[in-house]
Swiss-Prot record:
It comes from Shigella boydii serotype 18 (strain CDC 3083-94 / BS512). The gene is ulaD. This is 3-keto-L-gulonate-6-phosphate decarboxylase UlaD. Its EC number is 4.1.1.85. It is an enzyme of class 4 (lyase). One of its GO terms (biological process) is L-ascorbic acid catabolic process. Catalyzes the decarboxylation of 3-keto-L-gulonate-6-P into L-xylulose-5-P. Is involved in the anaerobic L-ascorbate utilization.
Length: 216
């Protein structure tokens, strides 16, 4: 089982605040996510600028595309994104369109599982050639006190068994990682637990150490 990668979510409102994070921890993570908030706040230039600064890192545009899959994904890939996200409620043809464009750029598409989705949809994504999904405990759910539970673990295992590369996100803290031990997680996303730590560098390194201990 390969080691899960570590992704930092830049859900900053401005590039200036995003740079405060990347200056510290870009070299400590595998993937730099231009979060949805930053995508809205700064547009695709955020993707272009971060990829220019860190060409050796995977840069994800968390655009959560809901429609116009080809147009919006092309905007992201032309800004040098490596991966883009499509929201789970999007029509299957939106996901297919985004994937078609991704292939032109040797990129990839992730289906963002935020909100309601079905196993029938999951099979449609697999049949369409989608390889990646993001299992997401929403920001608002976290704020309401919703914790990771057995239903989450069961769903993540099932997605993995279907052949998906599964990314896990949603207010992850270091203490959550053992919950997922034994599952071939593709990526763990940490946002505020790294960005807002007293020492973001040490927080990122602790995540990497824990991943190596649990999956090594």
């Amino acid at each position: 089982m390969s080691l899960p990668m570590l992704q930092v979510a830049l859900d900053n409102q401005t590039m200036d605040s995003a740079y405060e994070t990347t200056r510290l921890i870009a070299e400590e993570v595998d993937i730099i996510e231009v979060g949805t908030i930053l995508c809205v706040g700064e547009g695709v230039r955020a993707v272009r600028d971060l990829k220019a600064l860190y060409p050796h890192k995977i840069v994800l545009a968390d655009a959560k595309i809901a429609d116009a899959g080809k147009i919006l994904s092309r905007m992201c890939f032309e800004a040098n994104a490596d991966w883009v996200t499509v929201i789970c409620c999007a029509d299957i043809n939106t996901a297919k369109g985004a994937l078609d464009v991704a292939k032109e750029f040797n990129g990839d598409v992730q289906i963002e599982l935020t909100g309601y989705w079905t196993w029938e949809q999951a099979q449609q994504w697999r049949d369409a050639g989608i390889q990646q999904v993001v299992y997401h405990r929403s920001r608002d759910a976290q704020a309401a006190g919703v914790a990771w539970g057995e239903a989450d673990i069961t769903a993540i295992k099932r997605l993995s068994d279907m052949g998906f590369k599964v990314t896990v996100t949603g207010g992850l803290v270091l203490e959550d990682l053992p919950l997922f031990k034994g599952i071939p997680i593709h990526v763990f996303i940490a946002g505020r637990s790294i960005r807002d730590a007293a020492s973001p560098v040490e927080a990122a390194r602790q995540f990497k150490r824990s991943i190596a201990e649990l999956w090594g």
